[in-house]
Amino acid sequence: KKVVHENLKKSFPDLSQKEYLSLTKNFYKHLADILLEGLKGYSMSEYSLKKRFVYKNPEILDSHYNRGEHIMLMPAHYGNWEWAVLSLPLPLKHQIIGVYKPLRAALIEGFVGKRRSRFGLILNPISKTREAMNNPPKTPTAYIMMSDQHPSSRKKAQWVKFLGRDTACLHGADHYARKFDYPVYYMHIERVRRGFYEVVFSPLELNAAATSPSSIT
């Protein structure tokens, strides 16, 4: 709770105490919803998931698939990201590979991995990112890389201004997109109402090889 208050005050210094308290209350309510929805997602049917998690413009990626191009998708831990990675293979033509950090508890990792991949998602541990990117499959693939997690190495991190503060970001998506000239798209997840979301894909960079380091991040 102390961390939440400190972050709000640093990010929004002009808010009143009443506004801070309101934001804090809404944050915990939203967090509880996300956690419960995430658990529900492990048993949710394909029909229910499609009804609750709607992709508005998946066809924007079809031209890349038709040309046999791999692409990179950069969502964030915003909205229900668990439903995002779970449902992504359903509307897209691309094969989906998700780069992620495995859980430490092997039993839980096995269960979560199995449930996350039941609609076609291929999970790739972050420790094997280089191997996966240097040996791409023949099938046009969309790589999901969450870039808003805390990097394990601050030396390799890319630094950006976020909510007025210097913030360390993972460099992998930026690095590999430029190295292989992969088109990069942002997945914007919008909460329509409780338990219902919409996703819109928007291009971040379609000529990644021509960009400078950290520009995509």
Model region roles, listed by residue range:
Residues 67-128, 152-161, 165-167:
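Catalytic core of membrane glycerolipid acyltransferases/transacylases, capturing the structured
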